[in-house]
Amino acid sequence: ERIAKMVPAAELVRFSNSGTEAVMSALRLARAYTGRDSYLLVEGGYHGLFDAAMWMANLEDWNPRSNNDPEVVSYGKGIPMTLKQLAHLVPMNDSQRLEDTFKKHGHSLAAMLIEPIQGNCCAISARQDYVQLARRLCDEYGVLLIIDEVKTGFRVGKGGIQGILGVRPDITTFAKAVGNGYPISVVAGREDVMRTFRPGGAAHGGT
């Protein structure tokens, strides 16, 4: 109830054990709700060590003027290459590339996952207009916007970075400051989306 009062987007809240688990659950939830499998990541974001999040773009060898997507490569060995086709990546704060990617892949995306302040990349921050554009494009293409606030939640502001940016995501993940050392994390979001966690819907739990 306290989280819901502080974060307007947190209409319903569920708990997990770690930030990684929260993001895994958020992505699974988005796929279950939309019926789509692909997803969009912002290059440089860290969302935990699970297979779906362990991809990066080879931007150094990529020509942004081409019609081709940047090459997607895994963080390391042990990640099934069959998952590669589901992950799409865009550079942070490149509004044109974001729009182009949605035009090309938007109707197959379940979610866009963004860490607005990238904790593992020297705190590179998303511009407000970039995140607001992401919100608009997600609405236009029926894609769920997931804001990863595992590190920023209740640290940068009472309502998280989303409150500062003035953007309301469909799903949010919190950890770190939520537990202050205890193993706890949060998946929160729109009520209609969150109710997809149900028997016969998306699975959620843990030990």
Description of each model-found segment:
Residues 1-207:
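Conserved N-terminal phosphate-binding loop of PLP-dependent enzymes in the Aspartate aminotransferase
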